[in-house]
Amino acid sequence: MAERVLTQRELNRATLARQLLLRRVRLPVVRAVERIAGLQAQLASTPYIGLWTRLEGFRPQTLERALEARTVARGVLMRGTVHLVSSSDYGLFGTALEVASPGWITPEAEEIARRAAGSLRAYAAKPRTRVEILDWLEREHGIASDGTNRIWYALRLQARIAHAPEASLWRAPVHGPSFVSVEHNEVESEAARGELVRRYLAAFGPATRAEIAGWSGMKVRDFADSLDGLRLLRDEAGRELLDVPRAPLPAADTPAPVRFLPKFDNVLLDRRRVLPEEYRKLVVRKNADVQPTFIVDGLVAGIWSFKDGHVTTEPFAPLPRAAKRELEDEAGRLAAWLR
């Protein structure tokens, strides 16, 4: 049987559907965050906006309660970037990504972190500052910080240390972010990598092996043995695409409503699918600073800002009258929610 070929527009609609951007849904926060494989969260506020644009009736207090209950966690995961995920996924994804430590993390730092991880989880059961954790490491294990981020970064990965809830609350002033260990079930490394691949495809697919690697930070060889049971498809260029069976593949003409995305939203990572090349430099600035954007008919069409109680939009090109009205209506709803 010939492999199905998907057009660029069909791939666009597939990703939007899986990222809950074709229609808002009613889901508990933890389930929603798991459904979309987490949210980038360099800024504590961005997951709140990302969930508002995806969930019907979302209120900031809902996510705050999940943070305080420690059913979600905000910490370093894919590509060494801060993400908000469920606490269960924090352990699963962290185990899968142990093979993907940045090259600047030395083997010595990784070994130190492995030795200290178990006792650090207990020490960080209540919030600790970075200084407290490094002082503890020297006091309990006789290991002084080397003056770089190597040991600190390795500790956060190995011990599953995340930002404490108070560092991630809506509009909360943060003075000296603190960190806390995340309870999780131990998972075998290869099984964790296979599950991470499937979770990515369910949230962003179909995708190439290179796209899986680009999102996760793993190398293709790290998950090459974890691809059994996946569906094979092709894009218009003939590239092989992987997907989980029975995942949604909406028709190319499926309506895509106007949606506002926060800075660094995950859906922009595969820029070709949602972000037109001619607008890339307007959205992705120096130092990979990704601007808050809005999408019209499934594609990024401009950037937005919020000031003095109002959302201001800057389209990259003139919009059709109907799209402009829809954009204004959605901007009004976002402004009312942000006030």
List where the protein language model places each region.
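Long, low-complexity intrinsically disordered regions
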Residues: 1-274, 279-339
